[in-house]
């Protein structure tokens, strides 16, 4: 019976994540369409992503506590309703930046519950496989969401036209996906795991979050996995925009075709995640650190590419390496977090660091574009940064292993 309950909970979790992420991705395209219909300034389109990420920082100290205090399925249900509220604001002609920011608030509160429930359902040995399913469903939903959003706002598309404006009509249809996600979230059985957290005392929550942040950064395995996931997601957010600019200048591709190259990375991540679930166990995770160095080197090779098929192949390889790398690292971080604190706190700390890294790297990229830096130079700088950062992480891991082995040897002598 327990196995059946876990299977049902996991199916509902994956389905809720798929539809919610599908809607997030499609809604970004619809929000961009609304900006275009309003003849908004060009900088507002990438600013949508900033407004979406920023709530992750604002809610970092509180989202994990909420996910740990309430049943996580109920939290996922409520946060999908918040996202529905963001759609309603878009339909009410509230400025898209503000309305999409409300969706970001829902996503920020949703994430700790989504990942925090996994250690409650699975033993440590099964966490890599469970994470792989979540990552694969997320990547596939993002791919389909971009296509769905583009299709819904396209002139002459064969979708029901309930509203005259294409972008508003798309937003209305996308809101249905959030409703479906909420239904699946409501079907997740309530877990018996419930943390005692001072949810009514915000200042205590801030202190608890600060303590959780320090605990994870001081833990030998926690600090390595947290550094890696923060670097990866920051680099991934930047690479998403960098590929478009690089493909346009280096390969002469229009925007529509350049966007297809992002699919190569996403497909590679799916393959890498599936490989990780099949062959990588939790205790072997840190042996994959050199894979991060290989990703940085592969990015450097982009500057040598002059043909589209070579570019697609290289980006596919980058995606495979990334999927193979990040899924076990996520699982390791969740495992250490479960051992050191509550699951929701771990994911909140992870989100805080990852989104800080994303905003910082996107800001640097934006400044470089503002200064008219050549795209080839940006690609080289980006690849060198990832490579050197991973080499530092590998070196740090070596130092930690040496210290732990020395302490163990001293204990054995005594």
Question: Predicted regions span which residues?
Answer:
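C-terminal transmembrane helical hairpin of 12-TM major facilitator-type secondary transporters
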Residues: 286-326
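Hydrophobic alpha-helical transmembrane segments
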Residues: 97-100, 104, 129-195, 263, ...
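A single, central transmembrane helix in multi-pass transporters
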Residues: 18, 22-30, 153-172, 214-271, ...
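Extracellular/periplasmic helix-loop-helix junction of adjacent transmembrane segments
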Residues: 26-56
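Transmembrane alpha-helix termini and helix-breaking/packing motifs in multi-pass membrane transporters
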Residues: 29-39, 88-92, 144-174, 245, ...
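Structural signature of the two symmetry-related core transmembrane helices
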Residues: 74-89, 286-302, 380-384
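Juxtamembrane intracellular "pre-TM" segments in multi-pass secondary transporters
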Residues: 1-11, 190-227
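Substrate-agnostic recognition of the 12-TM MFS/MFS-like secondary transporter fold
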Residues: 11-28, 51-67, 71-83, 99-154, ...
